[in-house]
UniProtKB/Swiss-Prot annotation:
Xref: HAMAP family: Fapy_DNA_glycosyl
Assembly information from the UniProt record: Monomer.
Protein name: Formamidopyrimidine-DNA glycosylase
Single GO biological process annotation from the record: base-excision repair
Record bears the keyword rRNA-binding: no
Catalytic activity reported: Hydrolysis of DNA containing ring-opened 7-methylguanine residues, releasing 2,6-diamino-4-hydroxy-5-(N-methyl)formamidopyrimidine; 2'-deoxyribonucleotide-(2'-deoxyribose 5'-phosphate)-2'-deoxyribonucleotide-DNA = a 3'-end 2'-deoxyribonucleotide-(2,3-dehydro-2,3-deoxyribose 5'-phosphate)-DNA + a 5'-end 5'-phospho-2'-deoxyribonucleoside-DNA + H(+)
Mapped zinc finger ranges (FPG-type): 235-269
GTP-binding found in the keyword field: no
Length: 269
């Protein structure tokens, strides 16, 4: 599933080709992805793309008349192609530009979304979201205060979008391992010093993943079709039964909040 780094890599890949260009047409080959595709998106036709930003795992394609909000879901990807490039199976949305290029959205599982937001409106999917993890607003003071009296497992806590957005399963596993914090520990039991380290490691692992083009485990591809290379850097995610890179113990696997969790019971306390 594309997480924050993969979405940011997609934004960086498509932005140079789209920002400042005019939308000619929008083509929908399915009426519904995760949710119905709103026909208001047609209002973007004839509009200049002013910017492409990211909030949490959503991409915001902004024009003067409104914003297309794109979520990649479980298997979505975006590519910039020549307009005459024939659509393939699972190519559900084409945003055609007047310069002869198209932004094509592919999603085999159809669990992503294309949504509409009017100018100066905050869509309901973005309401109540926590701070971005790569900003100064996400820091040890902030998260330690949020964690007070929270008995939920620390891994589940840092994956809560109301606490901080975009810390997905892969990167939560990796950051907790780097911080030597057991993912089962209650959030309220994490010390201030450990929060200092964990917030630093979350920022570090996300920034590194972005630099390496994200993580391709199955479906994700960058805007140019290339895979993300951070999978080669994974320390514990998907490595159950293998030796811990820091000691001789085997990596354990269990589920926390219905998400696969990988950790070293010796290194992480």
């Amino acid at each position: 599933m594309p997480e924050l780094p993969e979405v940011e890599v997609s934004r960086m890949g498509i932005s140079p080709h789209l920002v400042g260009e005019t939308i000619k047409t929008l083509t929908f080959r399915t009426p519904k992805l995760r949710w119905d595709i709103p026909q208001e998106l047609k209002r973007l036709e004839g509009q200049v793309i002013r910017s492409i930003s990211r909030r949490a795992k959503y991409l915001l394609i902004e024009t003067d008349t409104g914003t297309a909000i794109v979520h990649l879901g479980m298997s979505g990807s975006l590519r910039v192609l020549d307009a005459d490039f024939p659509p393939a199976k699972h190519d559900h949305v084409d945003l055609k530009l007047t310069n002869g290029k198209i932004l094509r959205y592919n999603d085999p599982r159809r669990f992503g979304a294309w949504l509409w937001s009017a100018p100066d409106e905050i869509h309901t999917v973005l309401l109540g979201s926590g701070p971005e993890p790569l900003t100064d607003d996400f820091n040890a003071d902030y998260i330690a205060e949020k964690a007070e009296k929270r008995k939920v497992a620390v891994k589940q806590f840092i994956m809560d979008n109301k606490v901080v957005v975009g810390v997905g399963n892969i990167y939560a596993n990796e950051a907790l391992f780097s911080s030597r914090i057991n993912p089962l520990r209650s959030a309220s039991k994490v010390t201030k010093q450990e929060w200092l380290l964990l917030t630093k490691e979350i920022k570090q692992v996300l920034a590194t993943a972005i630099r390496q083009g994200g993580t391709t485990l199955k479906d994700f591809a960058q805007a140019d079709g290339k895979p993300g290379y951070f999978a080669q850097e994974l320390q514990v995610y998907g490595k159950a039964g293998e030796q811990c890179p820091n000691c001789a113990e085997l990596i354990q696997e269990l589920k926390i909040g219905q998400r696969n969790t990988f950790y070293c019971s010796s290194c992480q306390v």
